[in-house]
Regions:
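Catalytic cores of eukaryotic secretory-pathway lumenal/extracellular enzymes that build
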Residues: 1-210
């Protein structure tokens, strides 16, 4: 049996939404005690909007403290925080600007197990999460879920994606197969952190196809 814990990966770069994201994630979880946060905190001491001192004494939080001038990019930051993985059963990788539904953890675990029961050994739930308005939440949330579509190749060879609506989502009873991986929202087995770590040599574009 697994430990039921979720290793939450957040790479943040001077993001005014970081604190709100953490609070909402914790508040909306059915069991916050099962959450383990690993945060790459790329910040300036002069910034006031992303100070995470309120979580300093919470043993669930593992913070990689990085001066923003020393950052080597999103992929490097994600790789840094992945070093804190300690055998949690699941992992959730998100950006530092998100909002959640009530009992989001139960929803994700249920979908994950649903796919396992259908024969998928290590299912991964991913996609572009619909937008929200931080000044008008939850009323300002886009309610239609998105999928990832190919957009174009840039001259350097990296592939760009764009979100597109899942038109028949109200008729769906289970997740649909995805063609691409989104680094800004991914939920799967915790083993993913060790088996498919982020390549620290990528800066930003290219991380999702690497």
């Amino acid at each position: 049996m697994g430990n039921g814990k979720i290793f939450i990966q957040i790479a943040s770069y001077r993001d005014p939404q970081l604190i709100h994201t953490i609070r909402d994630c914790d508040m909306k979880a059915s069991d916050p005690s099962k959450l383990v946060y690993s945060i790459a905190w790329q910040h300036s001491n002069d910034d006031e909007w992303d100070q995470i001192h309120e979580f300093k004494n919470d043993p669930r939080f593992k913070v990689v403290d990085i001066d923003y001038k020393d950052s080597k990019g999103a992929c490097w930051a994600r790789n840094q925080l992945q070093q804190n993985y300690d055998g949690e059963q699941y992992t959730l990788q998100i950006d530092s600007h998100h909002r959640f539904v009530q009992d989001w953890d139960l929803e994700l675990i249920e979908m994950y197990n649903q796919l396992k029961e259908k024969g998928h050994e290590k299912p991964l739930l991913t996609g572009y999460v619909s937008s929200f308005d931080p000044d008008n939440d939850p009323a300002g949330r886009i309610q239609t879920p998105w999928k990832m579509n190919f957009d174009r190749f840039i001259p350097e060879g990296a592939v760009f994606f764009l979100p597109a609506s899942i038109d028949n989502y109200k008729q769906l009873t289970e997740p649909i197969p995805a063609r691409f991986y989104s680094a800004h929202f991914a939920f799967t087995t915790g083993d993913f952190v060790k088996e498919v770590p982020h390549d620290p040599e990528y800066y930003f574009h290219g991380e999702e196809i690497s």
